Amino acid sequence: MAKKGAGATRGVSAVRPTRALPVGAYLTVADNSGAKVIQIIGVVEYHGTRRRLASAGVGDMVVATVKKGRPDMRHQVVRAVIIRQRKEYRRLDGMRVKFEDNAAVIVTPEGVPRGTEIRGPVAREAAERWVRIGSIASIIV
């Protein structure tokens, strides 16, 4: 017997991309904000189970620390939105998507990008969820 309110047969990955980047993961920064490499130290709006590392995926906002970049940016705690991940994820139409690297864009707590351009492609999931990122993206995949 089906569970009440189960609806159509959709997998978990059909709802949102796989969370493949745990706390501690290093990301390349794909904008011109001055940071080059960041490390995830927290995931915004992540409600996990006991003693489990918080993980993030494409389109999620994370709290990160700048590891490499301009001297005024280094060692700062910033917010970032993940725009690419190497781990393959499945879309509703059945297409599987993966990128060459794990990348993020530095944003304000409201979600406005701090840079003015984004290098490389941006996942459609991130561009739809964060409209300001989608507006400055050159390629949306």
Curated annotation (Swiss-Prot):
Asked if the record carries the keyword Lipid biosynthesis, the reply is no
CDD domains referenced in this protein's UniProt entry, alphabetically: Ribosomal_uL14
Q: Which SMART domains match?
A: Ribosomal_L14
Q: Which UniProt keywords apply?
A: Ribonucleoprotein, Ribosomal protein, RNA-binding, rRNA-binding
Q: Does the keyword rRNA-binding apply?
A: yes
| Molecular function terms, GO-annotated | large ribosomal subunit rRNA binding; structural constituent of ribosome
PROSITE patterns in alphabetical order: RIBOSOMAL_L14 (PS00049)
Report the SUPFAM superfamilies cross-referenced here.
Ribosomal protein L14
What's a GO cellular component annotated to this UniProt protein?
cytosolic large ribosomal subunit
The family assignment reads:
Belongs to the universal ribosomal protein uL14 family.
Q: How does it assemble?
A: Part of the 50S ribosomal subunit. Forms a cluster with proteins L3 and L24e, part of which may contact the 16S rRNA in 2 intersubunit bridges.
- PANTHER family per UniProt: 50S/60S RIBOSOMAL PROTEIN L14/L23, LARGE RIBOSOMAL SUBUNIT PROTEIN UL14
Q: What is this protein called?
A: Large ribosomal subunit protein uL14
Organism this protein belongs to: Pyrococcus furiosus (strain ATCC 43587 / DSM 3638 / JCM 8422 / Vc1)
